[in-house]
């Protein structure tokens, strides 16, 4: 009974986090795009930069709360989700530290390096999870693995564009900013779909467990 109550609280918490995550994606995407187009010179946008950065932590929380819904080895999954969560936390810290990406400096290089490493960790962990998911699920559920990988690839591309910006800024600012904006929007859309899939799978799993538990109780009675 206690375990069931804990699961119910966990699902309620997940529902709240998913809603907040969607709001952050909705509000944070235009902030992220505008902040890049204004070269980080707008003070209001700089203050609001924490909103898109918070999305990383929310996604980590969603991944962590969803981990039990996946039909894989518990130890294997725990390691994958631990890596994913760590990567998003590192990304969050990197993003909230004020960094002028328009200048080539030691701080910029360190920020880009850390951002890149955390992106690779998240990318590898997601592939490991996705492979297990694709093996297990059939039909439309195959999409989940592809969506997760596509989302991370696009997100890493955003980071790369940000990284090469100081180098090519003088050559073709417009193209770099356009590519970054497009990647940000696409990445947001893909992450929104990922969150939706994760949320749906968790709800379906919990409903199935509840249904099985009810049937077993009925049979016992």
Please name every model-derived segment.
Residues 3-11, 63-77, 126-144, 191-215:
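Cytosolic juxtamembrane helix at the C-terminal end of the final transmembrane segment
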Residues 14-29, 86:
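Alpha-helical transmembrane segments
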Residues 30-40, 93-105, 160-172:
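Juxtamembrane "helix-exit" motif on the non-cytosolic side of transmembrane helices
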Residues 45-57, 110-123, 176-188:
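Alpha-helical transmembrane segments of polytopic membrane proteins
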Residues 75-91, 144-157:
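Transmembrane alpha-helical segments of multi-pass membrane proteins
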Residues 89-140:
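Membrane-proximal helix-loop-helix units in multi-pass membrane proteins
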Residues 116-131, 139-164, 186-190:
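Alpha-helical membrane segments in multi-pass integral membrane proteins
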Residues 152-221:
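C-terminal transmembrane-bundle signature of multipass membrane proteins
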């Amino acid at each position: 009974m206690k375990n069931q109550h804990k699961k119910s609280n966990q699902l309620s918490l997940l529902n709240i986090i998913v809603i907040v995550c969607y709001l952050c994606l909705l509000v944070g995407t235009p902030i992220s795009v505008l902040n890049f187009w204004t070269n980080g010179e707008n003070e209001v946008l700089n203050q609001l930069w924490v909103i898109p950065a918070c999305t990383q932590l929310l996604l980590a929380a969603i991944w962590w709360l969803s981990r039990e819904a996946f039909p894989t080895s518990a130890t294997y999954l725990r390691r994958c989700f631990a890596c994913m969560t760590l990567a998003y936390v590192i990304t969050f810290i990197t993003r909230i530290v004020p960094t002028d990406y328009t200048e080539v400096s030691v701080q910029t290089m360190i920020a880009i390096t850390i951002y890149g490493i955390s992106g690779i960790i998240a990318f590898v962990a997601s592939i490991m999870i996705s492979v297990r998911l694709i093996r297990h699920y059939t039909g439309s559920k195959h999409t989940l693995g592809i969506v997760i990988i596509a989302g991370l690839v696009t997100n890493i591309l955003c980071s790369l564009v940000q990284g090469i910006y100081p180098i090519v800024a003088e050559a073709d600012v417009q193209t770099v900013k356009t590519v970054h904006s497009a990647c940000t929007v696409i990445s947001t859309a893909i992450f929104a779909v990922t969150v939706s899939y994760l949320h749906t799978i968790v709800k379906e799993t919990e409903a199935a467990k509840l249904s099985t538990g009810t049937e077993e109780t009925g049979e016992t009675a």
